[in-house]
């Protein structure tokens, strides 16, 4: 049995044993009082990936050597894991492999796109890159980032450098570091709703506060030179002083103006806040590492932060390692910790988990508390068993009160309890909206996030539409957490131009999109994802058509259900939060999850394993019949209904039910 031991507030001396679900935590000890550090951290046993990170010299080797070898089209296993920190995954097309061909290795790039914000000029660069070096499409991720698929090894350096020269980056897209920071996709900017402006500020701070400090990125991709371009999201940090206080925010609209006058100031005080040492062990000694927060082995596992405002759960805030909720009075934020969805079929020590409310933090303390949470995960997260390395397992094992005490020890002060918040609601922000600053924004549905000019009569020409919209109206883009896209900075006179372009390029207005499609998400899965066991993105449209036909058959044609699909249990499309989810568990089967909330506030439950694609109507029909006939009121959602009844009652009913719906051709 493994033990996690810590002293917090000078009083917690008892060892915290593993929880009764058998979750194993690596042995570690950090002795703290609020006043001072009392003893060093005991060294943990490291798994192979942590050993690789430690030996890499801050993310350099053996990647440098493998990339220099252009005689091969692939890289070694160690470089494969190291390359993730640089924002790329090596992939091969399994369908080609199945045909007996040699592996056709290629690389996927994932950009860091804080808050999903993408200027039109950056989109044009990405469009050119996917046309000339990729597979002629782009994909919006569920964390508001871009992915470019199909890059060859010989082109990696050119493509990544071009992205950096455009004012973006792939650093922070992947790896055991802070990944893309999420934010509601609504570019609201008015004095009646200042919370959104403040949330943008804190999202940009989170994105910059945890940037890796190694020079490996510039050495490998830019020949050691510092590029002159500015990362556009930094302008949301700019204040009248170096306090990062959002009350001092300056409204910088122009990237060019920011670059000319203010970029160096922001860089300087972000560096100051990053390295500011309170003497309680957050910052590592310079003699030990070039990474003041991460250290030589970086974090035990990926780390995710989402920022939102009270009531707006468009980002799935409860699935993040840290959720930051701007309070309505703008005095501070509520901090949530310990969310995460990845799990493994048949392994009960892995599970999906929603974040818990930990504390209210006033504005002046936010950067320090965020650093303290990351430092706790750095020092106490599991580095021996990678499947249990996420922060959620540490919070689960310690309990929220003990975890909060540990954060307080690093922070050097006690934290207030979280404040009451508004009820949550989910919005995808599609359709037309007033931004509040004299401009409009318009959300366009993108099925499964794939930006492509699709083949076929009346098929959407999304790439051409976006290029023309940017060219004709000067609009910018925001990538949404539901894999759709927001056109922003639209002048009212250009609304008719956007409408005309939508018609020209076969883009449906949101009113014409089936709610099942609008609410759905899927991961890419086959053929490129090495973890996928079955289809997701390519099959979900067919599955939605079948479900709509089933609802019509049951005289439920007006119903909406939030549906998600993944090709494996790792949870990239956040299936466990959905009302109805299909989680791949076999070549032609899915584990059926039900009972998530329409407001995305709880994890659903596993209802049935190995549901065959060919007979999915028979699995769903009795559930829909119960929902139709037994709900408490006409507006009780499917997720709330099955959650209220529970698994046993559902199974009891379905055991004696004879389906009537015809099976579709799978």
Question: Where are each of the predicted segments found?
Answer:
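Peripheral terminal and linker regions in Fe-S/redox and tRNA-modifying enzymes
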Residues: 26-666
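N-terminal chloroplast transit peptides
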Residues: 1-22
